[in-house]
């Protein structure tokens, strides 16, 4: 069955290590779109961290979408308006912020516009996230946070060895209550239980009237597994972690070797 929707992760997949898109990948995406295929960037980033890439790819037209916050938000690409949203509550935030201190990890939380930290010793990785995602960073003590805030995701962030120790201390019931997954060796993302990239892709596919077997999803990290499993054609990058390769139908080339372009040429353009 012909592919009608391509869901592409950004960091480690679409993007080179310097956060740019290669000419070959741009050309392959443009060629797929010229054939009427929907292409959607599917990322843990907020809209602010996606918008410039949408412009670069000419993917901010009416009928273009993006999936942000690992599936918590499906948005119209042109203006960021909401198509579907599932957020964590203030009570979730307070519980998880306290848990982060108990397990020994730095912590931050994101709503649609802002990255919040209650850590006075702000983590390097929090600053890094603010810079890469181009989202303002605000210090706010947990008890002073507006209880009406809708948190699209919260994150435990730390040096990989410290973070892995913290993850090992998280009670199993917490891992069952929320979606808990790694997006990088130094990022653990925690979302509403109903949220992952797979449910985000499904929400958009339902809007567009596209079946799972008409979808190709491409990724490299643990947070990409759900959409790779959901899609009819699940593609792992050659630089993907082993668990992603295990669930994929195909392993393409690495992001340094235009792996996204190679997969699009194989499954869409041929």
UniProtKB/Swiss-Prot annotation:
Catalysed conversion reaction: sugar phosphate + H2O = sugar + phosphate
Cellular component terms (Gene Ontology): cytosol
Swiss-Prot/TrEMBL keywords: Hydrolase, Magnesium, Metal-binding
Binding residues for Mg(2+): 9, 11, 220
Its EC number(s): 3.1.3.23
Co-factor requirement: Mg(2+); Mn(2+); Co(2+); Zn(2+)
Molecular function in Gene Ontology: magnesium ion binding; phosphatase activity; sugar-phosphatase activity
UniProt pH dependence: Optimum pH is between 6 and 7.5.
Note accompanying the cofactor annotation: Magnesium. Can also use other divalent metal cations as manganese, cobalt or zinc.
Class in the EC hierarchy, top level: hydrolase
Residue positions of the active site: 9 (nucleophile)
Domain of life: Bacteria
Record: residues binding phosphate: 10, 43-44, 197, 223
Pfam families: Hydrolase_3
SUPFAM superfamilies reported in the protein's UniProt record: HAD-like
Task performed by this protein: Catalyzes the dephosphorylation of different sugar phosphates including erythrose-4-phosphate (Ery4P), ribose-5-phosphate (Ribu5P), fructose-1-phosphate (Fru1P), fructose-6-phosphate (Fru6P), glucose-6-P (Glu6P), and also imidodiphosphate (Imido-di-P) and acetyl phosphate (Acetyl-P). Selectively hydrolyzes alpha-D-glucose-1-phosphate (Glu1P) and has no activity with the beta form.
Subunit structure: Homodimer.
PANTHER family assigned to the protein according to its UniProt record, in alphabetical order: HAD SUPERFAMILY HYDROLASE-LIKE, TYPE 3, PHOSPHOSERINE PHOSPHATASE
Family membership noted in the UniProt record: Belongs to the HAD-like hydrolase superfamily. Cof family.
Protein name, UniProt field: Sugar phosphatase YidA
The organism's taxonomic lineage, starting at the top: Bacteria, Pseudomonadati, Pseudomonadota, Gammaproteobacteria, Enterobacterales
Recorded name of the encoding gene: yidA
